[in-house]
Amino acid sequence: MPRYLTQHTLACLTRQGAEALAQRMQTGEGARAERVLVNMVEGKLFGEFRADSRESLEAWLKKEGMHYDWAVRIEWETRDGKLAPAE
């Protein structure tokens, strides 16, 4: 299943609020976050998602009311120091 990286801007969200949002992202149906990274100082959240397609990810984010700045499919990644197709 393809992976996607998303960026979200957090407006006045507490650490507890960010944690609740991350938990929602990790239990989604149709799209599910494998990793969530947060910078509270800059108000940014990054999610690494598995989804069938970009369209299904975007539909899930919209259904959940989660605004995102951008979403990109992960096509390549480094493994053992070499660039390889993303799994």
Regions found by a protein language model. Give the residues of each.
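Short linear sequence motifs
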Residues: M1, N39-E42, S53, L61
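Short hydrophobic/aromatic beta-strand micro-patches
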Residues: Q7, E48-R50
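Short S/T/G/P-rich N-terminal loop/turn motif that feeds into the first structured element of a domain
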Residues: M1-T27, N39, W76-E87
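Short, glycine- and small/hydrophobic-rich beta-strand elements in well-ordered beta-sheets
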Residues: M25-F46
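An amphipathic, aromatic/His-enriched active-site/gating alpha helix that lines ligand/cofactor pockets
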Residues: G28-A31, D52-T78
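Context-gated lysine
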Residues: K44, K62-K63, K82
